[in-house]
UniProtKB/Swiss-Prot annotation:
NCBIfam families: rpsB_bact. Keywords: Ribonucleoprotein, Ribosomal protein. This is Small ribosomal subunit protein uS2. It comes from Rhodococcus jostii (strain RHA1). Residues 258-300 have a biased composition (Low complexity). Belongs to the universal ribosomal protein uS2 family. Residues 228-300 are annotated as: Disordered. Coiled coil: none annotated. The keyword Ribonucleoprotein applies.
Length: 300
């Protein structure tokens, strides 16, 4: 079964790129056409690249790896936090701190400080201090939780990084590449594909598009975790098809191009079975019927 369908991608607006004047020429091979001054991304390629990224993430997690989810733009913050939390992976959805990967030793010390402050608050460690001291400690804890709360349980640098909008998260991409950490990312028409190891051509500005593709990556993580535990894949982890708005004619045309390819395989399998059925019925027919069928020819 496909990880995600063409209709789901169309419904979420994954095929919409940027205006034709705002593009990266390196993305030309991923562009299907342009409509009203806006590039349309080739979703056939998107489906292919989704499968590649899905398999990579699943295998990475199955072998004990972790995937860091990164998306600090408003359109992606909620889905990044929700999906990463669902599958127990670290995430950054506020501000990317410089050195979060390349200087992880220092970042890890700040994580220990965050846990220390939280423990103090829960065990009554703030008691006996002045109001000003309590206020300063509370502010420090709040700030650390806002910026580092998503990676509080990350004990080492991740095995891979999932990025929504490589242009906005250029620091995260640069640090990952410096450490040779594979980058999986949504590539809009204004992005540089050379910076990404596992690209997924698509719209990184629409909330539904970013949420759908993030859910696909999270589903791959979930399947990898289950494979690591020796459990069967959970079908509910796959994204569900949502009811969308009516498709335009050119969108229906794009969708129809994918239909013959999807129907070809089942049709090819069904043909031999259809031919075999009459032969099986002929062999199973009673012997008494054969003379009755031949009787007219003998009299003639």
């Amino acid at each position: 079964m496909a990880v995600v369908t063409m209709k789901q991608l169309l419904d979420s607006g994954t095929h919409f790129g940027h205006q034709t004047r705002r593009w990266n020429p390196k993305m030309k091979r991923f562009i299907f056409t342009d409509r009203n001054g806006i590039y349309i991304i080739d979703l056939q390629q998107t489906l292919t690249y989704i499968d590649k990224a899905y398999e990579f993430v699943k295998e990475t997690v199955a072998h004990g790896g972790t995937v860091l989810f990164v998306g600090t733009k408003k359109q992606a913050q909620e889905s990044i936090a929700a999906e990463a939390t669902r599958v127990g992976m670290p995430y950054v959805n506020q501000r990317w701190l410089g050195g979060m990967l390349t200087n992880f030793t220092t970042v890890h010390k700040r994580l220990l400080r965050l846990k220390e402050l939280e423990a103090m608050e829960q065990t009554g460690g703030f008691e006996g201090r002045t109001k000003k001291e309590i206020l300063m400690l509370t502010r420090e804890m709040t700030k650390l939780d806002r910026t580092l709360g998503g990676i509080r349980d990350m004990a080492k640098v991740p095995s891979a990084v999932w990025v929504v909008d490589t242009n906005k998260e250029h620091l995260a991409v640069a640090e990952a590449r410096k450490l040779n950490i594979p980058v999986i990312a949504i590539l809009d028409t204004n992005c540089d594909p050379d910076l990404v190891d596992y690209p997924i051509p698509g719209n990184d500005d629409a909330i539904r598009s970013a949420a759908l593709l993030t859910k696909v990556v999270a589903s791959a993580v979930a399947e990898g975790v289950q494979a690591r535990a020796g459990l069967s894949a959970d079908k509910d982890a796959k994204p569900e098809a949502g009811a969308g708005e009516p498709l335009a004619e050119w969108e229906q045309e794009l969708l129809s191009q994918a239909a013959p390819a999807a129907e070809a395989a089942p049709a090819a399998e069904a043909a031999p079975a259809a031919e075999a059925a009459p032969a099986a019925e002929a062999q199973a027919a009673p012997a008494a019927e054969a003379p009755a069928a031949e009787a007219p020819s003998t009299e003639a």
